[in-house]
């Protein structure tokens, strides 16, 4: 988010009137939904190793794999239905982001939530990722090309809060969430952790991006952006290296 704000939107993303007010928001699609889907499923597969590292026994590993499967699956289906109803057709690109949003959302509580909690996480993640992308794009006019803020920031916060709300004492971690015990202690701890991470990350990334901007530069030139970084950075005739002449 800090980087997107400091770097500014891509050329042609926002069309402004003479008064400088945004009058049109242009969609700049990616190169290939097919390759995007492949990358999404590679990440999903790898997430079992990522979350599975929290296990300390076979039974806890099974529980973690269950929650890690349910949340992204439910998030994907939720976004499919939500965008279908809202726009008249499902948004495949947004559904791929929803899969990742569900994975991000369940990471904090992969060993603390049960199947029911995973479903709740997935439903909220599927709606949240769409809402955040649209707010950034249409309301705040912050250009986030891959929807990283909606996937990682928003759902990282949601997933961390979900532990305080939905943690089941019978799950492997044995934590007590507000829904099951009525106690708000865990929710308070999670909220404090979120606040600390947000402040630290915002401050550190602002400094890092300022240093980059004042030294090697944070953004490529307009000419390089128009030609495309596949050409200017990598010397490729297009984004698809397989189609380049030998």
Question: Where would I find each of the regions flagged by the language model?
Answer:
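Glycine- and aromatic-enriched membrane alpha-helices
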Residues: 1-246
């Amino acid at each position: 988010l800090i980087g997107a704000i400091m770097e500014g939107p891509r050329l042609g993303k926002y069309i402004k009137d003479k008064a400088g007010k945004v009058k049109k928001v242009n969609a700049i699609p990616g190169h290939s939904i097919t390759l995007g889907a492949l990358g999404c499923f590679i990440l999903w597969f790898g997430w079992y190793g990522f979350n599975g590292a929290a296990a300390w026994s076979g039974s806890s590993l099974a529980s973690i794999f269950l929650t890690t499967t349910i949340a992204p699956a439910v998030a994907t289906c939720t976004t499919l239905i939500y965008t279908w109803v809202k726009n008249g057709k499902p948004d495949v690109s947004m559904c791929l982001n929803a899969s990742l949003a569900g994975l991000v959302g369940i990471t904090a509580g992969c060993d603390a939530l049960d199947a029911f909690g995973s479903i709740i996480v997935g439903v909220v993640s599927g709606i949240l990722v769409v809402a955040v992308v649209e707010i950034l794009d249409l309301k705040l006019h912050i250009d986030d090309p891959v929807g990283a803020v909606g996937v990682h920031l928003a759902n990282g916060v949601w997933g961390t809060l979900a532990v305080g709300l939905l943690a089941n004492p019978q799950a492997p971690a044995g934590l007590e969430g507000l829904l099951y015990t009525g106690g708000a202690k865990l929710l308070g701890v999670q909220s404090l952790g979120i606040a600390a991470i947000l402040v630290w990350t915002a401050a550190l990334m602002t400094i890092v991006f300022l240093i980059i901007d004042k030294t090697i530069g944070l953004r490529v030139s307009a000419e390089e952006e128009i030609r495309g970084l596949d050409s200017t950075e990598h010397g490729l005739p297009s984004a698809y290296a397989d189609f380049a002449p030998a």
